[in-house]
Amino acid sequence: MSKDQIIEAIKEMTVLELNDLVKAIEEEFGVTAAAPVAVAGGAAEGGAAEQTEFDVVLESAGSSKIGVIKVVREITGLGLKEAKALVDGAPAPIKEGVAKEEAEEIKGKLEEAGASVELK
């Protein structure tokens, strides 16, 4: 019997017959059908965990470079020269490892000044 013939036979089975088949395979080969599903489910849950720390990354200064430099100075506490170098070097991280609320606030200020910002 080929693999295709087995698949066709399975397609014709009812749900109860499939349940019996799974139980018979588990007993015959000493395996459980639930174990791989549980492992895959656990991995998916781990990937779906909500991120708690964000990096605010300046993608570009846009058309209002001076306004963006002022906001970067306000946020980071850098001097004019350092803030300008940071803005000129975009894409560049502005703040790293900040809470979601603070990251959203910083993003809002920078976008208001005309910058393009991404949270990572």
UniProtKB/Swiss-Prot annotation:
NCBIfam families: L12. GO terms for cellular component: cytosolic large ribosomal subunit. Forms part of the ribosomal stalk which helps the ribosome interact with GTP-bound translation factors. Is thus essential for accurate translation. The lineage of its organism: Bacteria, Bacillati, Bacillota, Bacilli, Bacillales. PANTHER family: 39S RIBOSOMAL PROTEIN L12, LARGE RIBOSOMAL SUBUNIT PROTEIN BL12M. The keyword Ribonucleoprotein applies. Keywords: Ribonucleoprotein, Ribosomal protein. GO terms for molecular function: mRNA binding; structural constituent of ribosome. This is Large ribosomal subunit protein bL12. The keyword DNA repair does not apply. Belongs to the bacterial ribosomal protein bL12 family. The gene is rplL. Homodimer. Part of the ribosomal stalk of the 50S ribosomal subunit. Forms a multimeric L10(L12)X complex, where L10 forms an elongated spine to which 2 to 4 L12 dimers bind in a sequential fashion. Binds GTP-bound translation factors. Coiled coil: none annotated. GO terms for biological process: translation. Pfam families: Ribosomal_L12, Ribosomal_L12_N.
